[in-house]
Amino acid sequence: MLPFLRSELARCQPHHPNPGGTGMAMDILDTNECPYDLPTDLKQTLADRYVEAIASNRYPDGSHTDLKAAIVDYLSEQTAGQWQPGPEHVTVGNGSDELIRSILIATCLGGQGSVLVAEPTFSMYGIVAETLGIPVVRIGRDPQTWEMDLAAAETAITQTEGTPVRLCFVVHPNSPTANPLTEAEKDWLRQVPPQILVVIDEAYFEFSGETLLAELPQHPNWLITRTFSKALRLAAHRVGYGIGDPQLIAALEAIRLPYNLPSVAQLAATLALEARSQLLSAIPRLITERDRLYRKLQVVSQLQVWPSASNFLFLKTQSSSQTAALAAQLKAQGTLVRHTADGLRITIGSPAENERTLAHLQTAITQSLPATV
């Protein structure tokens, strides 16, 4: 390792999703994207706006003015008059990953604090924290319900030795396990002391229909993060946003990189919100497909599959080695799934993709997994 690099970076590995190299067409069901592209008419509108509105020799709007206004309009539908969001409540990032990094810098950098996560969960919280040299406190979940170990969580935030917890990440619904927060978990979040920031990741809000947005004004130590990469079909454009107390938002705006979101990404996200009724109309179909897959897999004796409030399913076999073999066999047949937390996370695709997933799973199970009684 080069002598000027921080020694702890030796533990960090580059992220290489969808490595390819198989020489065959693949169903990409490992990253929880929407299986449907932007409609052609919207792509054409975006192209027209690019020609009309973007000067390539000029930097993007560093304040995200139009995009924030569109986000505020979208949020106002969800708060239903309980409170009125404004642009001062919104920060925009180059994907939610940039927001995660800014949040960590704002709260925990320089030995100021550690991060609490309940695993399994979204891996980037721990990955980004480790690249910044920030300690991560990991607690578990119930292996059947996937509810957080709240006793361990309470112990973690009240301990007085070592670096105190200054930040807690939760996902609603969680990834990879697809379960929404329970009432007990929500009650625990409501009583987290004000010196700890609670980040509620609602990346899959449009699929679950569940949000804590209405409670945000009562909790200045809460931040809700969301993304355009899932239901709004803009994974290629890397747009995420956070909603929180104006003082918190001002701090995050101060430390993010300038011109962090390309002009075309801002145009695409604004257009997606303008056309949200069209784009979100696919969600009932995806939920129907999700529930169909769940019922099909539930009767397979070699698998344990959990109910989902999102656009993916999580399942396990009898052993981690069997699960790894199953993932490899699916890939060999042309279906990419995420092997994580000793299980498989399978994105809900188009009906044709889902049929292939079922067929490939059946072939792999027949070849390698003994039936259970």
From Swiss-Prot:
The modification N6-(pyridoxal phosphate)lysine is found at K230. PANTHER family: HISTIDINOL-PHOSPHATE AMINOTRANSFERASE, HISTIDINOL-PHOSPHATE AMINOTRANSFERASE 2. This is Histidinol-phosphate aminotransferase. It catalyses: L-histidinol phosphate + 2-oxoglutarate = 3-(imidazol-4-yl)-2-oxopropyl phosphate + L-glutamate. It comes from Synechococcus sp. (strain ATCC 27144 / PCC 6301 / SAUG 1402/1) (Anacystis nidulans). The gene is hisC. Pathway: Amino-acid biosynthesis; L-histidine biosynthesis; L-histidine from 5-phospho-alpha-D-ribose 1-diphosphate: step 7/9. It is an enzyme of class 2 (transferase). Its EC number is 2.6.1.9.
